[in-house]
A protein has these predicted regions:
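Glycine- and aromatic-rich loop/turn segments at beta-sheet edges
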Residues: 85-86, 90, 120-131, 171-177
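Short, well-structured active-site flanking segments
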Residues: 78-90, 154-161
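An aromatic- and glycine-enriched ligand-binding surface/loop that stacks and positions planar moieties
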Residues: 1-5, 109, 117-120, 134-212
C-alpha cells in the first residue's frame, strides 16, 4: 500500500540548516546507495577482463562505464562526507569492508580523476537506440571538468569544458525551461541522463524504475 500523505520535510530542513544528524535518511541513502554502485563497478572491473566470450569492443565499453560510474559515486560521496573509505576492488568479506579506514579526500579525488580519464579514453562518442543513456566519452570529460571546478583547478576545468564544447555535439537551449520538457529528454544540453520507464512503482526514493 502506498502512503499518499504528505510530510513536514524535516530531513530537508536539516540539510538546509546544515544541522544533519546521523539518522537523517537522505544521507544514509546517499552513503549506502553509492557504495552499492561502487561495489557493482568493482565487480565489473574484476570479472569482465576474464570473460573470453566477450568482444574486445564490448569489454572496453563495460570497463569504461564501470570506471565512469565509480568516479561519479565517489564524487557524490567526497563532496558530501569528505574523507571516505576508498575501495577499488571487491572486499573478501563484510568484515574486511567494515575495517577499511577513511581515505584522505585528496586521494579520493586522485582516483576519481584517474577513473574519468581512463573512461574518456575508452568510451564511445555517442550511443543510440537501446544503448541511449550509456556513459559516453563526453559525459566522462564533462564530469571531469566539474571535478576540477570543485577542486578549484580553473585552468583544467576550462580546458575540459572547452573540449566538450568543441566536440560540436552539445549546445544550449534558447529557453532554459526547454531542458525540462519531456519531448527534449536526452536533448542537446544533456551529457549524461539516467533513463527511466513508467509503471514499476511510485515510491520516490528507493526502487525507482531504472533501466540500466
Amino acid at each position: 500500500m502506498r502512503d499518499a500523505g504528505g510530510g513536514d520535510g524535516a530531513e530537508e530542513q536539516q540539510l538546509d540548516n546544515f544541522n544533519i544528524p546521523p539518522s537523517n535518511p537522505m544521507t544514509t541513502r546517499l552513503w549506502a546507495g553509492s557504495y552499492v554502485g561502487i561495489g557493482a563497478a568493482n565487480l565489473v572491473l574484476q570479472k569482465v577482463p576474464g570473460i573470453s566470450s566477450m568482444s574486445e569492443a564490448v569489454r572496453q565499453r563495460c570497463l569504461g562505464e564501470a570506471k565512469f560510474l565509480r568516479a561519479k559515486y565517489y564524487f557524490d560521496l567526497v563532496r558530501a562526507f569528505g574523507d571516505v573509505p576508498l575501495l577499488t576492488t571487491p572486499p573478501a568479506s563484510p568484515a574486511e569492508a567494515a575495517a577499511i579506514p577513511r581515505t584522505p579526500t585528496t586521494q579520493v579525488y586522485d582516483q576519481i580523476i584517474q577513473d574519468l580519464t581512463d573512461a574518456a579514453a575508452t568510451l564511445n562518442d555517442s550511443y543510440g537506440g537501446g544503448d541511449l543513456g550509456r556513459a559516453t566519452k563526453w559525459a566522462a570529460i564533462g564530469l571531469l571538468a566539474k571535478v576540477y571546478l570543485t577542486q578549484g583547478n580553473l585552468p583544467l576545468a576550462a580546458q575540459r569544458a572547452r573540449e566538450v564544447i568543441a566536440s560540436g555535439r552539445y549546445s544550449l537551449w534558447a529557453d532554459y525551461g526547454d531542458n525540462f520538457k519531456v519531448a527534449n529528454e536526452n536533448g542537446k544540453e544533456s551529457l549524461f541522463e539516467v533513463q527511466y520507464i513508467n509503471g514499476l512503482n511510485e515510491y520516490i526514493f528507493d526502487g525507482l524504475g531504472f533501466v540500466g
